[in-house]
Structures are given as structure tokens and as C-alpha cells.
Amino acid sequence: MSITNATISQRAKKWLEDDRIFIDTETTGLGDDAEIVEICLIDSAGFIMLNTLVKPTKPIPAEATAIHGITDEMVMYAPTWKDIHGAVASLFFEYGFVIYNADYDTRLIYQTAKLYGLENDGFCYFLNERSACAMMLYAEHRGEPGRFKGYKWHKLVDAAAHEGVSVEGKAHRALADCRMTLGIIDALAKGGAA
């Protein structure tokens, strides 16, 4: 194992030993007006801490539903972000997050919190600082040159397949994506696939 891969393995092990929470969201889209429609948080043992649909402030576009399968009918009676913000923040402050594509999910958490006037609490302030990006660690492990911070970014399902991590449930649903992220970090902690 190279020094770089040993360091990557050590970081992955540390995230697992620190009992970080693995988080994933599904959203109404990619833009500045997108918001969260599903969130899942699991611990490093795979225990589900929170797994819920989230009722957005506007209808879910058909393009987003085509990706994750979440419809307006499914979220009709779901809690709003305001209802779950405190629980998510509490878990964040206690454990910190590991996220596959942290920049995206932290932006969507902030955007969704802002819709409810919750963007100025400590949670949103520290979100980027205490969130580790599994995608960047994996990109560094693979070492393929790319235009994003020097490395090629790999889709979650592709990274999982390369590391021999099976998909439990439907990809592009928050629980399945959390489990894939945990599986990738577990694989990296053990040295990762060549």
C-alpha cells in the first residue's frame, strides 16, 4: 500500500472510529431553488438514526421524480424541514457527517433550512467545517486525474461497484445511498480495491 493509500485508509478508519454519521439526501433538483425531499442518517454500524421523506415547499419536478421515484403524493403528509431540522442538527453536533459529494448535500441542507429561516443557527454555520466528503476521499484513492480538485469524481454507484459494495434497496434513495457510502468508507479503511 502506498503512503497516499495508507493515509486514505487511516482517514477512513478515523471516520468510522469517530462514529461519524453517514448522511444522504434526495432533492427537488440541482439548482439554487432545490430543496430536500428525503433524508437519511445512519451510524458507522449501519443503524438508522433518521430516515424520512420531507415535504417540500413546492411540487417535486417530474425530472427529479424520474431519478429518485419520490412523488408529491408520497411527501404529502411527511414532516417539513422545520420539523426535523433540530434532530438533524443535534446528530450533526454530536457526531459530524460523512457525505458522498458533501458540497452538494451541505448546500441543499443550507438552502432548505433557509426556506424556513433556520440558516443562521450554529448548525448551518458549522456544516461545511464538520462534514467529511467521501467522494473526495474516494477520488483521491482512485488517483485518476480530473478537473475537480485534481481528481476525477466517481458516481456513487460506480464507486460502490468498484469496491464490491452491493446496493441494498434502490440507488438514488437516501437509505440505499447512505449504505453505499458507508460500504465505500469501510472498503477504504481496509485498503480499498486496486
Where does each model-flagged region fall?
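Metal-dependent phosphoesterase signature
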Residues: 66-88
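Metal-dependent phosphoesterase core characteristic of DEDDh/y 3'-5' exonuclease domains
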Residues: 2, 11-13, 17-19, 32-38, ...
